[in-house]
């Protein structure tokens, strides 16, 4: 089983990636990078990462989140985060990245924010 499982679904013009597992150096961060790059190549620029199932993220995973955010921003797209675990929220607060990302607890609220 891969470190990170990603299920993709559409909610209107927003692509939601439901993620479960770990975003770590190696398979996890590569899986995220590959998914984001593919979506951008397909012209899908409104992306919501549902991180409810992500139990662990290391510095490589954090780096990949930032890299994804930057890549999507360069394409005039938007990357937003949904359902952060307390551990991940604390990590983003410590690294001052909580102020960079738009973070939501409600999927409906997150989806409405793209309009």
Predicted regions and their residues:
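Short beta-strand/loop segment at the start of cytosolic alpha/beta domains
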Residues: 1-18
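Residues at the C-termini of beta-strands that transition into short coil/loop
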Residues: 20, 107
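Amphipathic alpha-helical interaction surfaces in cytosolic regulatory modules
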Residues: 23-101
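Acidic phosphotransfer microenvironment of two-component signaling modules
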Residues: 86, 108-109
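Short acidic-hydrophobic, aromatic-tinged amphipathic segments that line or gate anion-handling sites
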Residues: 102-106
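Short hydrophobic/aromatic patches at helix-to-coil boundaries
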Residues: 111-115
């Amino acid at each position: 089983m891969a470190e990170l499982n990603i299920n993709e679904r559409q909610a209107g013009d927003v692509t939601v990636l439901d993620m479960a597992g770990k975003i770590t150096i190696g398979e996890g961060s590569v899986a995220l990078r590959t998914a984001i790059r593919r979506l951008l190549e397909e012209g899908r620029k409104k992306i919501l990462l549902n991180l409810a199932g992500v139990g662990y993220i290391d510095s490589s995973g954090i780096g990949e989140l930032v890299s994804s955010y930057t890549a999507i921003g360069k394409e005039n797209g938007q990357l937003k985060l949904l359902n952060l675990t307390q551990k991940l929220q604390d990590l983003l607060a410590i690294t001052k990245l909580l102020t960079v990302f738009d973070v939501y607890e409600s999927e409906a609220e997150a989806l409405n924010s793209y309009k």
